[in-house]
Amino acid sequence: MYKIKTLNKISEQGLEIFDDNYEVGDDLEHEDGILVRSAKLHDYDFPAELKAIARAGAGVNNIPVDTCTEKGICVFNTPGANANAVKELVLCALILSSRQVIPGIEWVKTLPADDFGKAVEKGKSQFVGPEIDGKKLGVIGLGAIGVNVANAAVKLGMEVYGYDPYISVNAAWKLSKWVHKAATVEELFKECDYITIHVPATPDTKNMINKKSLAMMKDGVRILNFARDTLVNTEDIIKALKSGKVARYITDFGSKELVETENTVVLPHLGASTPESEDNCATMAVKEMIDYLENGNIQNSVNLPTVVEP
């Protein structure tokens, strides 16, 4: 019997896939596998029996991948399982970055009951915002989420530029032919009215949005970050917001300093917070775990090569 330890709440739809050969719980010891979402494992004492860790999500920054590799522990993720959920929220943010919806909502709450309608008509002009139709959107990173965002933006009438020097063949096949292929990220910075980031957090991508890159962008650019907080230099983006260089910054990863900065919208990491996404991620993670433990097959591992039984 295999022991599978859950370190976060995992969707029941995924857990139901385990049969009687598996003992699953959050208080097990000497586990063969770990299912995790956001729990940090950098200080976790891995038992000798541990063979695999499956993250119900794409990013693995909460897992010490190098340590796992040294110990022969296979680390899985679930690329694409939450792509639609994140795409939908990015599209929502795209509209919110352009139209003055949130400031308008907050303003309406302050109006007196008497002559409410007249007050609305008199003051609504202060919340004018541009349409996204015909505007240029730059998508940095063309993985599952980036491709979905780019394709959806094309359908909304935007002129879309994509940049990803490491785009996979599978992603390239799915990308709309109407997406312009930016030769460099600098080209994208200079051309686009809106920029959305969809790359992993690595030493190379840390602070990729900084004073230097912001200076290349159009005045009044709108920036979306639904990938990782470390991609954007907080101090530099705040200065750009205060100067008007950046018209609006919307992020799924924030800080108190950002929350208190005008023209910033900070969400509480809601990108994958849909029941469908949680089900998809859990189902994929569980299937990867079972296939590895029972058959030795490796798919979607971030530290070991793909191995699939013919």
For the regions a language model picked out, list residue spans one by one.
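Short FAD-binding loop at a beta-strand-to-alpha-helix junction that anchors the flavin cofactor
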Residues: 257-274
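An N-terminal-biased, well-structured beta-alpha scaffold segment characteristic
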Residues: 1-78, 190, 210-212, 216, ...
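Phosphate-binding beta-alpha-beta segment of Rossmann-like dinucleotide-binding domains, i.e.
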Residues: 79-136, 297-301
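Conserved beta-strand positions in the Rossmann-like core of class I SAM-dependent methyltransferases
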Residues: 5, 161, 230
